[in-house]
Amino acid sequence: MCAAEARPARVAMLGGTFDPVHMGHLRSAVELREALELDRVHMVPARVPPHRATPGVSAERRAALLALGIGDTPGLAVDDREIARDGPSYSADTLASLREELGPQARLVMALGHDAYLNLAEWHEPQRLFDLAHIVVIDRPDHDRPLAPALQELVAGREVSDVETLMQAPAGSLLALRLPTRMAISATSIRERLRRGDSIRYLVPEAVERDLLARGLYA
């Protein structure tokens, strides 16, 4: 067996409301896959996000828009397991489901933005997240907020400085990763533009724009 065949699978979960999906989400997923040399990035729309208001557009429609946005992009996939599951969309449960599918040796990563990371200690079963996966924080050059004591305690001794070290084990470590492209695009601003009737051209993929306008979503 050659070395490439022997390498454990590398898979990331990138969750969110995707309300709606935009170029920032998709570019981050592509660059995350490249930086970590991942086999797949599972983009997981939340049905009932635990830490924010439930979106006004259904989870099924948000997932359909996400599929339009991904198109035929290699290595990116819509994962609807949180939509199929009743109750709050807890990341720990999603990671447990992925871990069961992938097996104990797969390198499983949960990627999240820096703002979400600052509240990680308040998430459902935060310790279990590290039992199941690595956490990669998509870093921001302008962040300067100190970590809360509970978060410092949660991540103590887990930080690694490079991808090679991260991938030596199936789970349990924390890596801050600065991606090459940081787009100042927010789903909130896109929803506001749609309500005003302003253009969202080049903020979302063309297929997503067509579907949003045809259905009058967020208008």
Curated annotation (Swiss-Prot):
Enzyme Commission number: 2.7.7.18
Recorded coiled-coil stretches: none
Catalytic activity: nicotinate beta-D-ribonucleotide + ATP + H(+) = deamido-NAD(+) + diphosphate
InterPro entries tied to this protein: Cyt_trans-like (IPR004821), NadD/NMNAT (IPR005248), Rossmann-like_a/b/a_fold (IPR014729)
Metabolic or biological pathway, per its Swiss-Prot or TrEMBL entry: Cofactor biosynthesis; NAD(+) biosynthesis; deamido-NAD(+) from nicotinate D-ribonucleotide: step 1/1
Single annotated GO MF: ATP binding
SUPFAM superfamilies assigned: Nucleotidylyl transferase
An example Gene Ontology biological process: NAD biosynthetic process
Pfam families on file: CTP_transf_like
Parts of the chain that traverse the membrane: none
UniProt KW S-adenosyl-L-methionine keyword: no
Keyword field: ATP-binding, NAD, Nucleotide-binding, Nucleotidyltransferase, Pyridine nucleotide biosynthesis, Transferase
Taxonomy, superkingdom: Bacteria
Family: Belongs to the NadD family.
Protein role: Catalyzes the reversible adenylation of nicotinate mononucleotide (NaMN) to nicotinic acid adenine dinucleotide (NaAD).
The protein, known as: Probable nicotinate-nucleotide adenylyltransferase
Organism: Chromohalobacter salexigens (strain ATCC BAA-138 / DSM 3043 / CIP 106854 / NCIMB 13768 / 1H11)
Lineage per the UniProt record: Bacteria, Pseudomonadati, Pseudomonadota, Gammaproteobacteria, Oceanospirillales
